[in-house]
Structures are given as structure tokens and as C-alpha cells.
Amino acid sequence: VRLWPRSLTFRVIAFSTMWAILAQVVVFTLITTLYRQASERGFDSLLSAHLFNLIGSVGVSEDGRLTGAPDLGDLRFSEPRSGWYWSVEPASAGVTGGLRSSSMTGAIPSPSITAVPFNTEFQRSYVADGLAGEHLAVFESEFVLDTGNQIARFRVMGNESELEEEIAAFQRSLLIYLSLFGFGMIAINAIAILYGLQPLRR
């Protein structure tokens, strides 16, 4: 008879502990998933905004040469090999020259149109390898610059590896906080259960 309260106490504590661990796992998964989705949406929105700003900052001269001095308002586009780049290249006959950010110290190839086709708005996105080994998210668009049907290809590239590092750092911090909270909750539950079942031992 004396063993019964102890067995009951163990089972109740074990059940509450398993439930607390399961709840923490669900909360961790839910929060990290929502954070990743929000971060990726914000990242894509930023690249899209930079792309439209770039398109609005470039023109073509009378002899068909690309002109402009785009300023996207982000210092990372001026830091060499930062993982944040932009470029403007001719995409039709009669257009010459090219523009690129000072951060882009080398060429970054783009996939063929067959491999990654443009959508109905003449835009496409893909992942590429950066100049420093980072992964890049690339937003690309072809745009008609004037009435002469002169077309240029605009690309804005963001450091996707940097985004993944930020998400991983958030996940580590969240895991630490939830672990501390979980251990505290389990300890409090155990103490409460032991105290609550004490009358059964008499």
C-alpha cells in the first residue's frame, strides 16, 4: 500500500513532464515556422523594392548606352563581396554598356531562360552562388527603357546565407529560453504534485 502513492506520484509527474515537453516542441516549431515565413516575406519584399528602385534609376542615352547612378540606400551594395549586388545589362540589340554595384567585383552568372523562364510580367527569381561562397536570392526583370524597344536586364541580389544565419540565431535563442522555461515549469509541476499528493501518504 505504501508503494501506491509513490507509483501514482511518479506516473503523474511523468505524464505532466511529457506533456510539458510536447507543448514546448509544438511552441518551438510554430514560432520558428512563423518567424521564418515572416523573415522570408520581408526579405523578398526588400529585394522587390530594390529592383523597382533600380529600374527607375536607369535610362538609356541617344546612342543606346545604359546610363544612371542608382543609389538603393543600403551600404551593403557598396561593400565588396558583401552578398548584396545589383547589375544592369543589355537585353536587346542597340543597347550597350552595363552598370553594377561597387560590391559586385566579379561576374555572377544567371541561368538560361529555358531553365528559369520569366513570368508574364517579365520577372523571375532564382538562387545563385555569390562571390564569397554565399547563397544569393536573385530577383531579375527585363524592362523596356524607351519607345525604341530597347530592353535591359535588371538584377538585384540579396545574401540568403545571411538570412539563414539570422533565422538560425533566432532559433538558438528561442530554444534556450523555452528550455529554461520548460525546466522551470516541470520543476514547479513536480513540487506541486508532490505536495498535493502528500495527504495520500498518510
Can you say where each PLM-predicted feature lies in the sequence?
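Compositionally biased, intrinsically disordered low-complexity regions enriched in proline and serine
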Residues: 36, 44, 78, 85-87, ...
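Extracytoplasmic
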Residues: 103-176
